[in-house]
């Protein structure tokens, strides 16, 4: 299934990757790789991850304290937010 992104997702990812880049370039690459793999898993099987709110699903990264929310459309999934687990849990739920 195709993946589309909310316009602010790129900013979310850059912000998260920058934190890891400051620690280690390799760690930033590993974060990016895990995020891409997890998004691919969601695209392959959109119902794989549990519901979050009324219209989203939440996929947690395994090695990093981040998740992304996505919604399922007939022909694609749309990633709405990439966020840290400690950020407000409803952050991004109002993105459309």
Residue ranges and their predicted role:
Residues 1-32:
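Arg/Lys-rich, positively charged N-terminal/basic patches that mediate binding to nucleic acids
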Residues 9, 35, 70:
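GIY-YIG nuclease signature motif recognition
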Residues 15, 19-22, 41-44, 76:
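Conserved amphipathic alpha-helical interaction elements at protein-protein interfaces in regulatory
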Residues 67, 71-96:
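Enriched for short, Lys/Arg-rich terminal
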């Amino acid at each position: 299934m195709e993946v589309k992104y909310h316009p602010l997702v790129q900013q979310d990812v850059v912000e998260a990757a920058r934190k890891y880049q400051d620690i280690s370039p390799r760690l930033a690459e590993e974060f990016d790789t895990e995020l891409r793999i997890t998004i691919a898993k969601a695209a392959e099987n959109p119902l794989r991850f549990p519901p979050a709110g009324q219209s989203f699903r939440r996929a947690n990264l395994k090695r990093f304290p981040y998740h992304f929310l996505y919604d399922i459309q007939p022909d694609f999934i749309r990633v709405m937010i990439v966020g840290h687990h400690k950020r407000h849990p409803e952050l991004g739920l109002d993105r459309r």
